[in-house]
């Protein structure tokens, strides 16, 4: 979702207005994806590096996030009717506790939905995600939940917050990955467009999908996990939900 600030500058409005337009565009884009039967969408909403921006902008983005997640809670019945599951990936501990609570409530309230999963990379970088996944695996080795023979790139992929995308779209003319899903995109089709995110249209989305259809690689058959790996991964998943419940309870 790149280009919010440039959109604001282009239209001579405050940066905050550009970010609001960007969030509105996300809602619109999700409806298109639901109509098209796309089962999973991942957006890069806030990098850990974004904390280096001015305090005014970071505070404004935090308040915007609180407003939007509260709105999601207020409209949770509609979201559940649509079958949308929300998953926020990143270091939530870097945000104020009240925002952590809102995010946790939305994730818990939508955890059983299965029509479309919306992954929001928030307080996220690809390198940090890899670091945390490696830490989980090291802990598993220390606790003897897995053995050194179990550790391979397949296990690493499954220990990450986010799965492997088929298509990655970057808006606003940038041709960098900006530390996004670095491990997962080895087989991903990349699509770059000059369109600013708030101006992204259904036609831009369809153009990206056609690009994917023309360049999509052969489907790779997924490997089956051993019972030991399945148990380890289930523990990671259960721990995540327990942490969210703990945040809400505090």
Where are these regions (language model features)?
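Flexible, compositionally biased loop and terminal segments
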Residues: 1-250
């Amino acid at each position: 979702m790149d280009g919010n600030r440039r959109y604001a500058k282009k239209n001579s409005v405050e940066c905050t207005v550009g970010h609001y337009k960007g969030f509105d565009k996300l809602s619109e884009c999700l409806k298109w994806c639901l109509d098209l039967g796309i089962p999973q969408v991942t957006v890069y909403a806030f990098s850990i590096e974004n904390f280096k921006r001015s305090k005014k902008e970071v505070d404004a983005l935090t308040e915007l996030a609180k407003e939007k997640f509260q709105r999601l809670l207020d409209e949770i019945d509609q979201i559940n009717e649509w079958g949308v599951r929300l998953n926020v990936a990143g270091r939530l501990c870097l945000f104020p506790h009240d925002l952590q609570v809102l995010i946790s409530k939305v994730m818990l309230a939508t955890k059983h939905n299965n029509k479309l999963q919306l992954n929001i990379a928030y307080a996220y970088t690809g390198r940090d995600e890899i670091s945390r996944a490696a830490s989980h695996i090291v802990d598993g080795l220390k606790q003897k939940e897995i053995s050194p023979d179990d550790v391979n790139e397949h296990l690493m992929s499954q220990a990450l917050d986010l799965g492997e995308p088929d298509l990655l779209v970057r808006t606003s003319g940038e041709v960098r990955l900006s530390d996004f899903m670095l491990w997962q995109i080895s087989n991903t089709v990349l699509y770059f467009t000059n369109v600013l995110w708030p101006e992204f249209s259904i036609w831009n989305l369809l153009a990206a999908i056609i690009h994917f259809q023309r360049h999509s690689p052969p489907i790779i058959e997924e490997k089956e996990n051993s019972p030991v790996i399945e148990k380890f991964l289930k523990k990671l998943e259960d721990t995540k939900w327990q942490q969210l419940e703990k945040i809400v309870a505090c």
